[in-house]
Amino acid sequence: MLRSKKGFTLIELMVVVAIIGVLALLGLRLYTGQQQKAKNAIVKANAGTIQTLIQAELADTTSSTVDVMVDDGTLFAKSGIHIPDGGPQITNDTTGVVGTVYVVYIDTPAGEEYFTINGNSFSTDGGDVFTTSLTARK
């Protein structure tokens, strides 16, 4: 009696499953990396929006700081910006700052990524990314 040899051996199936697992792992790493880049781009755009709003506020008022605008949440109400992770808005207080306005601290809920704008630089996690003209002076 002859048996036909149709199908795959167990070793062949295990090799295929291992290859699929490796490809899935690589795809997942690339996907999460792209997600983080997109979130960072949103936060940078939000920081630019805040810069524009604060400069407009300083041009419209006689105040040299924007404490009220930042502290009471009206800045975020005016801009409609949000943190891509859905976390709370966090802002630095500008009390006591003369001349240069130190404005934005945006933090993700996990607390691992943050972007800061001050009068001299735009930074991510404390490292300079590029300089910006947020030195809105009265």
Predicted segments with their positions:
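Generic low-polarity alpha-helical segments
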Residues: 1, 43, 116-119
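N-terminal single-pass transmembrane signal-anchor helix
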Residues: 3-31
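Short intrinsically disordered, low-complexity coil segments enriched in acidic
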Residues: 1-2, 135
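Generic cytosolic/nucleocytoplasmic N-terminal low-complexity/intrinsically disordered segments
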Residues: 4-5, 43-45, 77, 91
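Glycine-centered flexibility motif
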Residues: 15, 33, 82-86
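Periplasmic/extracellular, small/polar-rich flexible segments of pilin-like filament-forming proteins
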Residues: 56-138
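Short, low-complexity interaction segments enriched in Ser/Thr/Pro/Gly
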Residues: 2-3, 36, 75, 89
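Conserved hydrophobic/amphipathic alpha-helical signal-anchor segments
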Residues: 33-72
